[in-house]
A protein has these predicted regions:
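Auxiliary Fe-S-binding modules of radical SAM enzymes
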Residues: 1-11, 179, 189-328
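Canonical Radical SAM [4Fe-4S] cluster-binding loop centered on the CxxxCxxC motif
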Residues: 4-44
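Residue-level signature of catalytic and energy-coupling elements of molecular machines
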Residues: 16, 184, 265
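Glycine-centered loop/turn positions within well-structured domains
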Residues: 22, 126-127, 251, 277
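A short acidic, helix-capping loop that chelates divalent metal ions and anchors anionic groups
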Residues: 32-36, 125-132, 193-197, 278-279
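Glycine-rich, proline-tolerant flexible connector loops at the mouths of alpha/beta enzymes
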Residues: 34, 66-68
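Radical SAM/AdoMet-radical enzyme domain recognition
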Residues: 40-63, 70-187
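Short histidine/acidic/glycine/proline-rich micro-motifs that form metal-
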Residues: 68, 160-164, 191, 196-199
Length: 328
């Protein structure tokens, strides 16, 4: 699929649930209201859409949430998607998870043909982790990471940079990743959902966040490309591959290749835009041609770049969606 700016859209992120067993402070409110189950796409509906997306050129799929592994019978969807990997219809099936249930599901993910998982982990300090996740258990996440590696899954740690909260966690995290053969990707906070003003106060550019690491080690740019927007560096001596996702300080939209399917069947063409089309209604009305028409409409809606800067400047434009509802 080619959008209006000549970008090849071959990557679909599917949010399978807006629910999560954590309440990370930068992702959702502590008292989050979740969608009723009747509003969620069923697994059959997700697979029907996946087959249409594949026909239109999607080659990579990432499962997200919320926390994807808390949805009941998620193994049904994973195994069905795995069949498309094994048949050569998909080049890549991956998942972003908080890791808390990874120990249980690692064997299934590996057998389904998944090669890699991203684990969201912002600190190795148990108390700080509990505070950021609002009650999460660090030990379960670490056990999940080790289980994934034991089943030959590559693991990339996603660490959100939080000013005055986890700046001191970067050096221990870099050491941990290097020692365990994990990639590390650092992510700037984005102005989504309630509490945007608070999130602005916690924002720190990755140039500043990585300063302690740069003071100790040389960084060398890598040609490595993933399906996502990260720029990669080799951290000398550590032998660490470090990715930087910088939506605020270094825009990367020129090479965007992705669209997002929410758990209630909406297609968002950009994380930083409210433009979307609703596929669930067309599915449930039983009009296949409407689904294909809406996909083409969605392509035309994809903006050239995100609108985070203008949203910060004009409070009335700020997005009400929380990250867990979009599948960031």
């Amino acid at each position: 699929m080619i959008d209006g700016f000549g970008r090849n859209i071959d990557y679909l992120r599917i949010s399978v649930t807006d629910r999560c067993n954590f309440r990370c402070t930068y992702c959702m409110p502590e008292q989050q209201t979740f969608l009723p189950h009747r509003d969620l796409l069923t697994y059959d509906e997700i697979m029907e859409l996946v087959e249409r997306f594949i026909a239109h050129g999607i080659r990579k799929i990432r499962l997200t949430g919320g926390e994807p592994l808390v949805r009941r019978d998620i193994e049904v969807l994973i195994e069905a998607l795995g069949q498309h990997v094994k048949a050569g219809n998909l080049d890549e099936l991956t998942m972003t998870t908080n890791g808390s249930r990874l120990q249980q599901f690692a064997p299934l993910l590996a057998s389904a043909g998944m090669k890699r998982v991203n684990v969201s982990l912002d600190t190795l300090n148990p108390d700080a982790f509990r505070q950021i996740s609002r009650g999460g258990d660090l030990a379960s996440v670490l056990a999940g990471i080790h289980a994934a590696r034991a089943h030959d899954l590559d693991v990339k740690i996603n660490m959100v940079a939080l000013k005055n909260e986890n700046e001191d966690a970067l050096l221990p995290m870099a050491d941990f990743c290097a020692e365990n053969g994990l990639d590390l990707t650092l992510i700037e906070t984005m102005p989504l959902g309630a509490g945007v003003l608070e999130r602005e106060e916690r924002y720190i550019a990755l140039d500043d966040f990585t300063a302690p690491l740069r003071a100790l080690y040389d960084f060398h740019p890598l040609a490595h490309k993933s399906a996502g927007p990260a720029r990669y560096w080799r951290v000398d001596t550590l032998g660490l591959r470090l990715g930087l996702i910088t939506p605020m300080s270094h825009n990367f939209c020129d090479h965007c290749n992705r669209i997002r399917l929410t758990t209630d069947g909406k297609i968002y063409m950009c994380l930083g835009s409210e433009l979307h089309v609703d596929l669930r209604k067309a599915l449930r009305d039983g009009v296949p041609s409407d689904v294909d028409h809406l996909l083409q409409t969605a392509l035309r809606l994809k903006p050239q770049r995100h609108e985070f800067e203008s949203q910060l400047a004009q409070p009335g434009l700020r997005l009400a969606r929380h990250m867990n509802a979009t599948g960031g």
